[in-house]
């Protein structure tokens, strides 16, 4: 019970890094000596100290004989920082409680082995689900090579995204559209299509989220920590030009193409050629490539064609649908273009995860039918 | 503050009649003498005593000099029961607090006038909104001549009601379908179409709701109180025959037609001829006719054609949509057949009133955009 109590606190601490640690996971650490919390820390940003180091430094002498509660297995290899396992022994920690092992198959279990070898008592699995939940993208990328993929949509209650004449501004309310900024800021990359750019000419950046109380708290240590997601535009026909708003907007942008062109592109634009036999951009290749760029969380913001292509591949982990209390009718544009199913058992299934009212609209979060 | 406190109790009592009082409204009454509740009552069923009479009888002598809290203006005319106003004075009540006036324009205000004339102090308007809310159908029928109209639908998250081949069994889960029984039992009439009867051959009755705890409580005084809603089938082409399941099933059923036929119908079937110049059944005429049958609450359970016709008339007070976490795609059948709108400002708008999860599905209750 005590272990759960302190691990909950460590997870709460870990969440403070939710907007800033990626590609690293969120990690929190609490050091407890004789039922007194003597130190705590959390990981802020890649290249900065790990949670354990902050916690040990605040504990000082009091770490001797204490228990460390860590939301993720401590590292035992020299990366950008010296290994946390060494620090834990150096400070005299006698027991380590770990929520879950490191999912990186190259290092998973090594920290535990190291600690045990150095006479430290190790408990594994306390609130493991919760710890994995706050690092879904990191865990999925490490274990499958594919980032966590969210698909964002906005529709009427009868599942329509635009009128027959294309008008869709605006089906949902200001508040719902502002909420999208918060979904974006939790993403490492936003995938969109050249169709969306040609039609809407969006910036695809995170804007005006600093006035949010929670973000103020998360970012108060340094506003510069909030990073813009990488914008990824699928442009197989080279239709995007240097004059589009998203191109002029600073911030890394990947143009995913089959062939490069001879335009002069700003330095923050990177043409990535994804060619294969089919002469089409393979979306699985794309998300695997993004995983290699250490992208944990992808947000898809596109029209029904690209959204449907991802849906058919069965790689959407989360659907985020903003629903306005309007009815657009049968002439309006559908949410998805799918096949003509013969049986209800064949259709894509999800499960409702979280329902909130955002202003006049509903925000539905659904997860893959079989994902936990 | 005390008035609100006691009126809340009276409204809670009134709700006990929610499945049984129609066509009468739900009414509760609390009698308070010197800060002590000395009597209480609620209306159970048309023809039975009014709430005030029960409350006065339980108070007896203690009603003298007491305050009566009544959720609706007491009657002053001799109807099926002697007027409550007379009883209130006879028992020596000195003050009456009324949530709201009787909406029936023929009698509204008469009770208050009578009480004042007999030296009783009258306060009007305590929790009036709450009192109207528990009698929405009654108030709307009395003030507009049109019952409260609910439209029930079931769809996928992309707003589809069936696959292209017509398969719709079942999009939603058992639990959601069972919940529909509770929606039916709160209705005085269910409107459906001959299309639905020919395709699904449903009974359109309330079934298996007595195992519900709340209903057990509501009905414990007498199970016979739960009445079946009147089934109303729009059958302009005389396609329903005596062999359909809903016809064989006992319980009043109105066949709404343009011409009668020569079939021999069971005595619980009533052919109602609604003819007009257009040779079509006018849905406004239909609901006004049902209001004359003292129908307070109508539930529409039909396919997209009839549902859309009601929607276009702008007389739907409440939309009840069960949404399954499935995606049926663009080939599947739409929720509504409407016009090809040119502007988003022209589309039907509602507002989300209540969202609940029923098993795997969502139940959305929406109300008319401008209704309170």
Curated annotation (Swiss-Prot), chains A, B:
Keywords: Hydrolase, Metal-binding, Multifunctional enzyme, NADP, Oxidoreductase, Riboflavin biosynthesis, Zinc. Its cofactor is Zn(2+). Transmembrane segments: none annotated. Zn(2+) binds at residues 50, 75, 84. Residues 1-145 are annotated as: Deaminase. Residues 146-372 are annotated as: Reductase. Pathway: Cofactor biosynthesis; riboflavin biosynthesis; 5-amino-6-(D-ribitylamino)uracil from GTP: step 2/4; Cofactor biosynthesis; riboflavin biosynthesis; 5-amino-6-(D-ribitylamino)uracil from GTP: step 3/4. Substrate binds at residues 168, 184, 204, 207, 301. NADP(+) binds at residues 154, 170, 196, 200, 236, 303-309. PROSITE patterns: CYT_DCMP_DEAMINASES_1, CYT_DCMP_DEAMINASES_2. GO terms for biological process: riboflavin biosynthetic process. Gene3D superfamilies: Cytidine Deaminase, domain 2, Dihydrofolate Reductase, subunit A. InterPro entries: APOBEC/CMP_deaminase_Zn-bd, CMP_dCMP_dom, Cytidine_deaminase-like, DHFR-like_dom_sf, Eubact_RibD, RibD_C, RibDG_C, Riboflavin_Biosynth_HTPR. Pfam families: dCMP_cyt_deam_1, RibD_C. GO terms for molecular function: 5-amino-6-(5-phosphoribosylamino)uracil reductase activity; diaminohydroxyphosphoribosylaminopyrimidine deaminase activity; NADP binding; zinc ion binding. The active site is at residue 52. Its EC number is 3.5.4.26, 1.1.1.193. The keyword Zinc applies. Disulfide bonds: none annotated. It catalyses: 2,5-diamino-6-hydroxy-4-(5-phosphoribosylamino)-pyrimidine + H2O + H(+) = 5-amino-6-(5-phospho-D-ribosylamino)uracil + NH4(+); 5-amino-6-(5-phospho-D-ribitylamino)uracil + NADP(+) = 5-amino-6-(5-phospho-D-ribosylamino)uracil + NADPH + H(+). Binds 1 zinc ion. Residues 1-122 form the CMP/dCMP-type deaminase domain. In the N-terminal section; belongs to the cytidine and deoxycytidylate deaminase family. In the C-terminal section; belongs to the HTP reductase family. NCBIfam families: eubact_ribD, ribD_Cterm. Converts 2,5-diamino-6-(ribosylamino)-4(3h)-pyrimidinone 5'-phosphate into 5-amino-6-(ribosylamino)-2,4(1h,3h)-pyrimidinedione 5'-phosphate. This is Riboflavin biosynthesis protein RibD. The lineage of its organism: Bacteria, Pseudomonadati, Pseudomonadota, Gammaproteobacteria, Enterobacterales.
